[in-house]
C-alpha cells in the first residue's frame, strides 16, 4: 500500500450546493469510494445509502457507520442496481443521487489494485475483484481487439501501434511493464504533462469493468428512484463519460430539437421530460485545482427530477421514502 495525502472529494462544494441536502432527507451516494460525498451528506443531516461494487471500499466504510444513528447504510452493489437494492430495503423514492464516475482515488492510490501506471503493482484493474483481470486481457486478446478497446474507450489515436507493441511484449503482468511498453511505442518526453500510458490504462479499465454500460444503466436507475423535485449530481472525468451524461439529460429534459425513429419527440406524443437542468455544467476553478489536482478534467452536471414517469414505464405511484 502506498502512503498518500487524505482523500479530497472532487467539486464537493459544488456537488452539495447542487443537491441541497437537508435534515431528514434520503440520498444515494452511488460511488462511495473513500466516503467523501457521503460524509458531506451526513453532515447536512441526510440519511445516506452508500453503494460501492468494490468490497474494499465497503469494508473500510464500516468505521464511518459508528455514531451515525443508523443514517448510513452501506450497500455492496453496483449503482446500476440502486432501484432494486433500495426496494429490497423498503425504499421506493429518494431525494438525491450522486455519482462520481470512474476509478476512485482509493483504487488509484493502492498499487496492489493495479489501476495506476504511476506505481508498480500486479496488472489487475478489477473493481469487484472477480472476472478477467487486465493481465488476462493484454495477454490473451488478439491485436485487433486490443486496438478496438484502446480506440473506442481510450480515444487513443495510435491504438494499432500500441496494440501491436503490447502483443509483441507479452507476457505482461505488472502495471509498470504495461506503462513502459506504451511509452516506448508512443514516445515519452519527461516534461510532457500527460503520460502516454493514460489512455491505454483508462481504456482497459473501462472495458474490464463495463463502466459505460454501468453508467447508462445507473442514470436510468436514478431516474426511477428520484422523487419529483429530487436532484441528480454526476461528476465525470472523461469526454466519453460526459457525453453519455450530457446526452441522457438532454434527451430526458426534452432539449433534443426533434424526434427520430430512435428517440420520440415529446411534442409529438412521446414521453414527457423527466428531468430539468438546474445549472450549466461546472468545471474546477483555480482554487479547486490547487486543492485537488484530480479535478482538472472533472465536469459536474446537476438536474432536477420532474413529476413525469420514468421513460419506458407506467406512471409512478406515491412511494415510500426512508
UniProtKB/Swiss-Prot annotation:
A Pfam family it matches: Methyltransf_5
Low complexity compositional bias, start-end: 295-309
Matches recorded under InterPro entries: RsmH, SAM-dep_MeTrfase_MraW_recog, SAM-dependent_MTases_sf
Record's GO cellular component terms: cytoplasm
Annotated region described as Disordered, given as residue ranges: 254-322
Keyword S-adenosyl-L-methionine in annotation: yes
Function: Specifically methylates the N4 position of cytidine in position 1402 (C1402) of 16S rRNA.
Protein name in the entry: Ribosomal RNA small subunit methyltransferase H
Native source species: Rhizorhabdus wittichii (strain DSM 6014 / CCUG 31198 / JCM 15750 / NBRC 105917 / EY 4224 / RW1) (Sphingomonas wittichii)
Lineage: Bacteria, Pseudomonadati, Pseudomonadota, Alphaproteobacteria, Sphingomonadales
Originating gene: rsmH
Amino acid at each position: 500500500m502506498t502512503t498518500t495525502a487524505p482523500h479530497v472529494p472532487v467539486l464537493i462544494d459544488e456537488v452539495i450546493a447542487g443537491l441541497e441536502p437537508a435534515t431528514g432527507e434520503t440520498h444515494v451516494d452511488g460511488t462511495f469510494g473513500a466516503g467523501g460525498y457521503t460524509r458531506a451528506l451526513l453532515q447536512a443531516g441526510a440519511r445516506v445509502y452508500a453503494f460501492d461494487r468494490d468490497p474494499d471500499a465497503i469494508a473500510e466504510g464500516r468505521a464511518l457507520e459508528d455514531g451515525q444513528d443508523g443514517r448510513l447504510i452501506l450497500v455492496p452493489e453496483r449503482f446500476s442496481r440502486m432501484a432494486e437494492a433500495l426496494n429490497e430495503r423498503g425504499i421506493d423514492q429518494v431525494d438525491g443521487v450522486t455519482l462520481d464516475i470512474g476509478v476512485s482515488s482509493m483504487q488509484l492510490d493502492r498499487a496492489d489494485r493495479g489501476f495506476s501506471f504511476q506505481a508498480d503493482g500486479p496488472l489487475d484493474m478489477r473493481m469487484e475483484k472477480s472476472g478477467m483481470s487486465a493481465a488476462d486481457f493484454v495477454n490473451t486478446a488478439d491485436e485487433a481487439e486490443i486496438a478496438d478497446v484502446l480506440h473506442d474507450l481510450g480515444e487513443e489515436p495510435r491504438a494499432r501501434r500500441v496494440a501491436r507493441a503490447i502483443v509483441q511484449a507479452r507476457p505482461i503482468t505488472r502495471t509498470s511493464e504495461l506503462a513502459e511498453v506504451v511509452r516506448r511505442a508512443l514516445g515519452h518526453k519527461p516534461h510532457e504533462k500527460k503520460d502516454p500510458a493514460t489512455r491505454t490504462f483508462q481504456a482497459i479499465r473501462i472495458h474490464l469493468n463495463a463502466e459505460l454500460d454501468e453508467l447508462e444503466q445507473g442514470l436510468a436507475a436514478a431516474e426511477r428512484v428520484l422523487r419529483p423535485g429530487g436532484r441528480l449530481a454526476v461528476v465525470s472525468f472523461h469526454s466519453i463519460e460526459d457525453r453519455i451524461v450530457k446526452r441522457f439529460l438532454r434527451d430526458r429534459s426534452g432539449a433534443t430539437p426533434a424526434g427520430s425513429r430512435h428517440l420520440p419527440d415529446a411534442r409529438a406524443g412521446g414521453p414527457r421530460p423527466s428531468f430539468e437542468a438546474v445549472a450549466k455544467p461546472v468545471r474546477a476553478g483555480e482554487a479547486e485545482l490547487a486543492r485537488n489536482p484530480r479535478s482538472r478534467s472533472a465536469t459536474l452536471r446537476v438536474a432536477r427530477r420532474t413529476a413525469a414517469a420514468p421513460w419506458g414505464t407506467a406512471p409512478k405511484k406515491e412511494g415510500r421514502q426512508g
